[in-house]
UniProtKB/Swiss-Prot annotation:
Family: Belongs to the PurH family.
NCBIfam families: PRK00881.1, purH
Lineage: Bacteria, Pseudomonadati, Pseudomonadota, Gammaproteobacteria, Pasteurellales
Record flagged with keyword Chloroplast: no
Name under which the protein is recorded: Bifunctional purine biosynthesis protein PurH
Catalysed reaction, written as an equation: (6R)-10-formyltetrahydrofolate + 5-amino-1-(5-phospho-beta-D-ribosyl)imidazole-4-carboxamide = 5-formamido-1-(5-phospho-D-ribosyl)imidazole-4-carboxamide + (6S)-5,6,7,8-tetrahydrofolate; IMP + H2O = 5-formamido-1-(5-phospho-D-ribosyl)imidazole-4-carboxamide
SMART domains: AICARFT_IMPCHas, MGS
């Protein structure tokens, strides 16, 4: 396919970042400018020669700007096939438009405002913009469509290399971006309006109707491929990593990789688990994860202390694990890790220059800097099933001291309460059935993923015993209620002093009585944290 010279461009943008400089570059290269409304006014204010679309078409903007570019002289100039439609274009006075520069009304920003009304949303549905974008993308053989201001400099550079022309490869790539842009835009609109109707399949359920505003009738998702991978969870599976560009919260998706090999599928999944867990803590914390489960979590006076205590829980499982911190990774901690263990990934809000130098001794270790976080943003979680998608709120629920209900005769001490809340936060990130033993803000044993809650407790005890850690005097957290007293009896045998769990079983009183028989503290949270 041939290069196409850019002689005339139509510019109509809502986000005007960089548009003046780009227009100046086009004019410098001999390109004639057409424009509309606010964009035309801005270009004229910067002494750029610009023709208003209404002057070109002979038809004024009308209906408060709702109709500006919906005209045959505009779309004929964009859609006209060079070499095929030249005669009809000349007959009707239609000039070829070789480049269209458009970004759309800020619908997402508008509906995100707390005071946004339906009328506000409707007025921010762009009509002319997407129409021009689709027209130009369809005719990419002859026309360049630009929807992202990050492409401005590269386009001008290519024009310089190709006598003010753009290659077919570039035009095709720009067309793909354009279709992605309009697809995402329409998806946002569909999702917004879909939240305003009652779900037609479950109209008889009043409670579901009350909550329907959270989940649109049709769910449209837009993710951008960030990374192609050698393979997926297993070597026979192909894989790629897609990200939501609207998410700004510190995460594995937004993190900056400072060194190391490319992240694998499992690296990303495990790093996400580690980072989301360490975000739960305010004091200096370290979380070590293996196969998406915490194998060691601790708080400390600093992150070196926290790391040493987290590692102590299960050094065997920590080998080849993922380490997450909620403070800057410093030189001392980096050196301790390098000297002590093999690690796949380290992630922290920030990494000091000295720590980076230390980590260069292990150049294959993936070192990530994710930035600071101040709060957890509300979001949806997804689980794919064959033929469907389960959607729910992300589990951001946590409890504080004031939310706890002490149901045992013995009351917890201040330190026991701290340990119970620490233990509860960890249990939230352990696969169900989850049992966590902890003491002095350090995990002592973790039992994960067992079909029987009692066996998860046994595994937690075995883990502690294998590492020479004392279970006696520990607190225990369970992600869900105890259906029978056997779990409490087993905990008492190994010296557990306090138990925290949601409660809600038909046999709660039987379980509470068991705690009292063993002079244990029992605290209910009223909140379950299943994790499958």
């Amino acid at each position: 396919m041939a290069d196409r010279p850019i002689r005339q461009a139509l510019l109509s943008v809502s986000d005007k970042t960089g548009i003046v400089e780009f227009a100046q570059g086009l004019v410098k290269r001999g390109v004639k400018l057409l424009s509309t409304g606010g964009t035309a006014k801005l270009l004229a204010q910067n002494a750029l020669p610009v023709i208003e679309v209404s002057d070109y078409t002979g038809f004024p903007e009308m209906m408060d700007g709702r109709v500006k570019t919906l005209h045959p002289k505009v779309h004929g100039g964009i859609l006209g096939r060079r070499g095929t439609d030249d005669a009809i274009m000349q007959q009707h006075g239609i000039e070829g438009i070789d480049m269209v520069v458009v970004n759309l009304y800020p619908f997402a920003a508008t509906v995100a405002k707390p005071d946004c009304t339906l009328a506000d949303a409707v007025e921010n549905i762009d009509i002319g913009g997407p129409t021009m974008v689709r027209s130009a993308a369809k005719n990419h053989k002859d026309v360049a469509i630009v929807v992202n201001n990050h492409d401005f400099n590269a386009i001008l550079a290519e024009m310089d290399q190709h006598q003010n022309s753009l290659t077919f490869e570039t035009r095709f790539d720009l067309a793909i971006k354009a279709f992605e842009h309009t697809a995402q835009y329409d998806s946002m609109i569909a999702n917004y309006f879909g939240q305003l109707v009652k779900p037609y399949h479950i109209a008889e359920e009043e409670e579901a109707n009350a909550k329907c505003g959270q989940f649109p009738r049709t769910l449209n998702l837009n993710f951008v491929r960030k990374q192609a991978m050698r393979y997926g969870e297993n070597s026979h599976q192909n894989a790629a990593f897609y990200v939501d560009l609207n998410v700004k919260e510190a995460s594995v998706a937004t993190a900056n990789q400072l060194q190391g090999k490319a992240l694998s599928y499992n690296n990303i999944a495990d790093t996400d688990a580690a980072l989301e867990c360490v975000k739960e803590f305010d004091d200096p914390a370290c979380v070590i994860v293996k196969h998406a489960n915490p194998c060691g979590v601790a708080l400390g006076k600093d992150i070196l202390d926290a790391y040493n205590r987290a590692y102590q829980t299960d050094p065997t499982s920590a080998f080849g694990g993922i380490i997450a911190f909620n403070r800057e990774l410093d030189e001392k901690t980096a050196n301790e890790i390098v000297e002590r263990q093999f690690v796949e990934v380290i992630i922290a809000p920030k990494v000091s220059a000295e720590a980076q130098e230390v980590m260069k001794r292990k150049k294959n270790v993936r070192l990530l800097e994710c930035g600071e976080w101040t709060s957890r943003s509300e979001r949806l979680d997804f689980k794919r099933v064959n033929g469907g998608l389960l959607v729910q709120d992300a589990d951001l629920g946590m409890v504080g001291v004031d939310d706890l209900k002490v149901v045992s005769k013995r009351q917890p001490t201040e330190q026991e309460l701290k340990d119970l809340l620490f233990c509860w936060k960890v249990a939230k990130f352990v696969k169900s059935n989850a049992i966590v033993y902890a003491k002095d803000n350090q995990t002592i044993g973790i039992g994960a993923g067992q079909m029987s809650r009692v066996y998860s407790a046994k595994i937690a005890g075995i883990k502690a015993q294998d590492e020479g850690l004392e279970v006696a005097g520990c607190v225990m957290a369970s992600d869900a209620f105890f259906p029978f007293r056997d779990g409490i009896d087993a905990a008492a045998k190994v010296g557990i002093q306090c138990v925290i769990h949601p409660g809600g079983s038909m046999r709660d009183q039987e379980v509470i009585d068991a705690a009292d028989e063993h002079n244990m503290v029992m605290v209910l949270t009223g909140m379950r944290h299943f994790r499958h």
